[in-house]
């Protein structure tokens, strides 16, 4: 049994196995209807609980479709259904769910909820997102980069904007996959120093550059994310916009990267805030391949967790 809680907690050889498996499974589905089953049915007779304390479009749909394609069934539970930690303890919830289902995916706010769920569950637990990390997204991003440009090892990735949970998982991935990462953004939104040092301890170059034009020079991949939550108050949105406007990814900024550089954004996006529509819809953008690859990467993660 394998939990998938964070990239830095997973052996590099296992991460490579997941990426390679995802690529094989994606290739095998070419030309098939979305609802057609995979040739192999590794999740036949398996039930996967999908827990959403924090709502999502991509995570819910991609996991649900992936389970169905592999022959399994899903049980979707919202925060209102569960009330995690506000009645029954998380530990007891984990123990009970483990008697009903074969795998648990949880998308939550507090990483401590994820950690406790994994500690007491007797089935694998997958981190669908926390406020601290988002490893499934980065596995999809690496799959996307490698299908367009080959191995990511030794490449330069630039993160522009807020050093948030997706940025944190990119830092973890840098150490495990062997690519360099430059963060460019305001000092008040720097990524967690603990994550920076962890990546550096693996021998990769992690740099902080306040000037975005300098940061993206020679980049193989430029990545950003939404500046504000879709649910943030207007005052918070205005404050973040003032801080982050210099770090918007536009055509002028992308021109400083390598000509073959790719652009990624995990979506949803506030178009023309963190990135211009010109870039998002341009030839260097792979944002919709990236979104599709959530499906394939997560299918491979589930197979790895269950060893099927």
Curated annotation (Swiss-Prot):
Gene3D superfamilies to which the protein is assigned, alphabetical: Aspartate/ornithine carbamoyltransferase
Enzyme class: transferase
Binding-site residues, L-ornithine: 165, 225, 229-230
Entry keywords, A to Z: Amino-acid biosynthesis, Arginine biosynthesis, Cytoplasm, Transferase
HAMAP family: OTCase
Gene: argF
Entry protein name: Ornithine carbamoyltransferase
GO terms of molecular function: amino acid binding; ornithine carbamoyltransferase activity
Family label: Belongs to the aspartate/ornithine carbamoyltransferase superfamily. OTCase family.
Catalytic activity reported: carbamoyl phosphate + L-ornithine = L-citrulline + phosphate + H(+)
């Amino acid at each position: 049994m394998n939990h998938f809680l964070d990239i830095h907690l997973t052996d590099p050889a296992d991460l490579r196995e997941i990426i390679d498996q995802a690529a094989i499974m994606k290739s095998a589905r070419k030309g098939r209807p979305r609802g057609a089953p995979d040739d192999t049915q590794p999740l036949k007779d398996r039930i996967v609980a999908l827990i959403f304390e924090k709502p999502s479009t991509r995570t819910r749909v991609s996991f649900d479709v992936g389970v169905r394609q592999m022959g399994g069934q899903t049980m979707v539970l919202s925060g209102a259904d569960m009330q995690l930690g506000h009645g029954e303890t998380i530990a007891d919830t984990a123990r009970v769910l483990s008697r009903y289902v074969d795998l648990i995916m949880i998308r939550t706010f507090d990483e401590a909820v994820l950690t406790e769920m994994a500690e007491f569950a007797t089935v694998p637990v997958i981190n669908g997102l926390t406020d601290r990390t988002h490893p499934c997204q980065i596995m999809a991003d690496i799959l996307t980069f490698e299908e367009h440009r080959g191995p990511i090892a030794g490449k330069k990735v630039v993160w522009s904007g807020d050093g948030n949970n997706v940025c944190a998982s990119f830092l973890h991935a840098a150490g495990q996959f062997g690519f360099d990462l430059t963060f460019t953004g305001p000092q008040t939104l720097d990524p967690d120093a603990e994550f920076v040092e962890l990546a550096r301890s693996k021998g990769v170059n992690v740099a902080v550059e306040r000037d975005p034009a300098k940061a993206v020079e020679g980049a193989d991949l430029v990545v950003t994310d939404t500046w504000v939550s879709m649910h943030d108050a207007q005052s918070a949105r205005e404050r973040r916009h003032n801080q982050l406007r210099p770090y918007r990814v536009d055509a002028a900024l992308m021109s400083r990267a390598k000509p073959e550089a790719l652009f990624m954004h995990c979506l949803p996006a506030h178009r023309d805030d963190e990135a211009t529509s010109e870039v998002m819809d341009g030839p260097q953008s792979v944002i919709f391949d990236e979104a599709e690859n959530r499906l394939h990467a997560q299918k491979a993660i589930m197979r790895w967790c269950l060893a099927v």
